[in-house]
Amino acid sequence: MPVACSLSTIALYASTDKKAAADLNADTVMLTIYKNNSATSMTCSATATTTLHQVVSNTCTSSPVSFNAGDTLGMEWTHSNASFTLYTQYGAGLRCQ
């Protein structure tokens, strides 16, 4: 981080873009924030429906993380559906001020 800030908000979305007929389960995408290569308790998740291109969003504000100048911020993305035929698009915006 170039300057000190408090990461207070994650705005996350997920959307199913491609699936096979056998893909009946939704996919939950979760983002975990890392500070200096260590996981923090700040997470955010959204569960994409099985309807193609239906966007599901979530805004998370619990467990803010304070960063000092020189700290590193990392993101770990995980998802619940391991199907090789299900494609979930996801993304997030972060507010650190």
What are these regions (language model features)?
Residues 1-7, 62-66:
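Extracellular and analogous surface-interaction loops
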Residues 1-3, 23, 97:
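Short, conserved, surface-exposed binding loops centered on an aromatic residue
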Residues 5-22:
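A short beta-strand element within beta-rich, extracytoplasmic domains
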Residues 27-97:
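Aromatic- and Gly/Pro-enriched, solvent-exposed loop/edge beta-strand patches characteristic
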